[in-house]
From Swiss-Prot:
Functional note: Converts 2C-methyl-D-erythritol 2,4-cyclodiphosphate (ME-2,4cPP) into 1-hydroxy-2-methyl-2-(E)-butenyl 4-diphosphate.
Encoding gene, per UniProt annotation: ispG
Entry protein name: 4-hydroxy-3-methylbut-2-en-1-yl diphosphate synthase (flavodoxin)
Taxon lineage: Bacteria, Bacillati, Actinomycetota, Actinomycetes, Micrococcales
Reaction equation(s) it catalyzes: (2E)-4-hydroxy-3-methylbut-2-enyl diphosphate + oxidized [flavodoxin] + H2O + 2 H(+) = 2-C-methyl-D-erythritol 2,4-cyclic diphosphate + reduced [flavodoxin]
GO terms for biological process, alphabetical: isopentenyl diphosphate biosynthetic process, methylerythritol 4-phosphate pathway; terpenoid biosynthetic process
Amino acid sequence: MTSVSLGMPSAPPPVLAPRRKTRQIKVGSVGVGSDSPISVQSMTTTPTTDINATLQQIAELTASGCDIVRVACPSADDAEALPIIARKSQIPVIADIHFQPKYVFAAIEAGCAAVRVNPGNIRKFDDQVKEIARAAKDHGTSIRIGVNAGSLEPGILKKYGKATPEALVESAVWEASLFEEHGFHDFKISVKHNDPVIMVAAYEMLAEKGDWPLHLGVTEAGPAFQGTIKSATAFGALLSRGIGDTIRVSLSAPPVEEIKVGNQILQSLNLRPRKLEIVSCPSCGRAQVDVYTLAEQVTAGLEGMEIPLRVAVMGCVVNGPGEAREADLGVASGNGKGQIFVKGEVIKTVPESEIVETLIEEAMRIAEEMGEADGEDAVKGSPVVSVS
């Protein structure tokens, strides 16, 4: 069989816009800002007081590609759990603080990499910024000023009537000015809303007002399907213009699903190296094979692989050969058989019953070759299915 060169392209893939230039901060070992890759975050759903369960969920998130994790801290018992969690977590931990400013100081003392503060609901927050800034600077802790449409300050709500983009931005800029007034600059900002249109407008406005790193998020985005659409729409609009330095996809779903979606959004925009991608046609009356089943079986068979490989599963002769040729590995099916392509070359034709097995075997062979070339284990993670 002909040897075919595979792997990442020699030139970097194109992006829609250069990153907006921002100041650089650190969240533990992870850089956040225009000089660093865009990071993906999630938040644990376990009670923070259940240290073992929380650390287990953090381990699962880490394995799925999470860069930074946030944990809730609504009580003194939660604050007491933070030192162990921060010390044992494989990735930087952010403590999420509302209402009680004393927990901000507890989280900083506990060794959390960062603290998220909500100026809209922490009592007398503005009066304590000086002390928070000093403590954070002394411990090397960064801050996220997390403005949320659901918890704006009463004065701002009275001024604007509701959570408009202008209201969100005014709250964020005011709090940023207080930290900067006290010589503290290691913070990022979020201005979250559950409406992607308002959220996008707020971030665009905020991006014009300073060089702060921005944490993107659509708050209360909803169940998995709806939340994925909202987040992909909003993040795509902003990231394609260079706005955004770290993201959190909020879903009413297991946190690992948030990481899968976030990583896929970044990969789709060429903002993170592409990994295994399965391209499959949506099927139609021309299809001569069960494309749905083929795609599902190939996906299941390749679960656990994490390599820059595009696999095309096509069901007819219209787009099938072309898509299969464009992919690293693919099949164009019809008349009870499938033509197997590797980098545009037909390497064999197999009966329909052997398509899945053949694709998996070829993918494994390619993965092994790529792993040997890179000196790495290419079999880890899980593939992402994109239906075209």
